[in-house]
């Protein structure tokens, strides 16, 4: 198990279970199982300023989200939960990076205020509205919600900051014509008049047919008379096939910036909806709804198109069903994914293995995905976390007593639990019942000891617990193999 410096550690193998003892930060993709806050701290020294784009889809704090986190905090607890993670994530972003956060209307306004404080209101780029549903739910008494939001911030929103552009659709290109066979190629004939009127740009134009033309009432020409003469001499003014129409300005496709600027309303026809996402998951897992709240691959494709380029590093620390990582692999981005829930081994990692094998769902056909790629899988090495999970999953008082005895003795786990210095063991009273004692046992555990610290890696009691391969992997990851 590879220990995360100053915080915790990780078991490792590739997605195909190959033994590895090294990690190339410039090439390898990384999946980490464990608490995402601790994992982010663990990554900070190695990846600060190196992540081009972050996308996260955190628990929405509604009580209805299928994230197996505590998805019904009060507002203040949820905001602290988010704040701790966003502050570290911000340090990982490169100077030209962006962070994209999916959220629903329930917490979007609170999150916006929090994010402004962390990232700087001046770095807020915009709020995207994604149409996640298209059919109304008639059981609703007021409104049937059909959209979520995506908040977008830049690490450095200078005046020169630009996002990438979206590819032009075929129908957009088809609207460019070349009726007069201009050697510069196809163009759009843009309106030559604009409003409100600018007095100096109101003048008479004579068409090739000899007709005298003035701009419509309340309007003036787009250009001054001097500029019009220059454009006319350069054959950039079009008067229609018969030379008798009002002037138009030729806007050549060859001179327009590649792609189009993204709008802030994303419809389901463009980027998919929730049901599309669920179908994508079902198609990968024999028709089973393996994950309740995935995002459609087309949505993530658009986000990565706008915020990153090939070979850039993309981070998602609420990895879920691994949609971000699957799309990143298909789009030739490097990625880091973090997930603490057990479905990482039944959904997330198997999904990425299917991507490597060349599965043809989601955006695969759009990008001509043929398979390939790899990733390194790591787990934070649990210390108190193992005991905590045992307490949480205990089904009765006898099972709880057994966990408590192991916490104190270390039987079957090689090491006893780290008990909080604030804990009062005398308060354990088995006559109080199951629920009360479960709560007390959770409080006993030192939350700073959920995972083994990298600083402990050479301690004999820790060194004896990890394999030589994991030891070497950690040394390579944090110290370049020293």
Model region roles, listed by residue range:
Residues 1-17:
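Core domains of carbohydrate- and sulfate-ester-processing enzymes
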Residues 287-298:
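Conserved SAM-binding loop and adjacent beta-strand
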Residues 49-64, 115, 314-328, 381:
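Conserved proline-anchored active-site loop of SAM-dependent methyltransferases
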């Amino acid at each position: 198990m590879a220990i995360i410096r100053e915080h915790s550690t990780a078991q490792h193998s590739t997605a195909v279970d190959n033994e590895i003892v090294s990690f190339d930060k410039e090439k390898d993709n990384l999946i980490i199982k464990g608490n995402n806050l601790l994992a982010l701290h663990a990554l900070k020294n190695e990846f600060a300023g190196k992540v081009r784009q972050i996308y996260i889809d955190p628990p929405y704090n509604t009580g209805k989200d299928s994230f197996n986190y505590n998805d019904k905090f009060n507002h203040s607890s949820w905001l602290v939960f988010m704040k701790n993670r966003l502050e570290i994530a911000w340090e990982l972003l490169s100077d030209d990076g962006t962070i994209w956060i999916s959220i629903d209307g329930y917490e979007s306004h609170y999150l916006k205020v929090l994010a402004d404080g962390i990232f700087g209101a001046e770095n807020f780029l915009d709020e995207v509205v994604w149409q996640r549903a298209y059919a109304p739910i008639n059981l609703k008494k007021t409104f049937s919600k059909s959209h979520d939001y995506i908040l977008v911030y830049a690490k450095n929103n200078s005046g020169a900051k630009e996002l990438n552009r979206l590819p032009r659709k075929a129908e957009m290109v088809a609207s460019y014509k070349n009726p007069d066979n201009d050697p510069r190629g196809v163009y759009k004939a843009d309106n030559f008049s604009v409003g409100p009127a600018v007095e100096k740009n109101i003048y008479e134009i004579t068409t090739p047919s000899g007709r005298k033309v003035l701009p419509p009432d309340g309007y003036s020409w787009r250009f001054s008379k001097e500029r019009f003469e220059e454009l006319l001499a350069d054959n950039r003014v079009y008067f229609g096939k018969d030379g008798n129409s009002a002037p138009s300005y030729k806007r050549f496709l060859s001179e327009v910036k590649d792609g189009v600027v993204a709008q802030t309303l994303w419809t389901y026809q463009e980027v998919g909806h929730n049901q599309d996402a669920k179908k994508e998951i079902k198609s990968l897992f024999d028709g089973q709804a393996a994950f309740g709240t995935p995002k459609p691959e087309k949505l993530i494709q658009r986000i990565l198109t706008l915020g990153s380029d090939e070979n850039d590093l993309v981070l998602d620390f609420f990895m879920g069903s691994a949609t971000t990582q699957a799309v990143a692999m298909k789009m030739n981005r490097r990625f880091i994914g973090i997930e603490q829930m057990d479905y990482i081994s039944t959904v997330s990692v198997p999904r990425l293995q299917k991507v490597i094998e060349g599965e043809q769902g989601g955006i695969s056909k759009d990008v001509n995905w043929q398979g390939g790629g790899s990733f390194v899988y790591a787990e934070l090495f649990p210390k108190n976390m193992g005991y905590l999970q045992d307490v949480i999953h205990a089904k009765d008082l006898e099972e709880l007593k057994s966990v408590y005895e192991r916490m104190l003795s270390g039987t079957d786990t090689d090491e006893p639990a780290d008990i909080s210095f604030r804990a009062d063991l005398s308060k354990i009273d088995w006559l109080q019942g199951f629920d009360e004692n479960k709560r007390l046992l959770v409080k006993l555990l030192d939350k700073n000891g959920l995972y083994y610290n990298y600083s402990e890696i050479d301690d004999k009691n820790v060194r004896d617990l990890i394999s030589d391969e994991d030891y070497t992997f950690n040394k390579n990851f944090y110290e370049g193999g020293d």
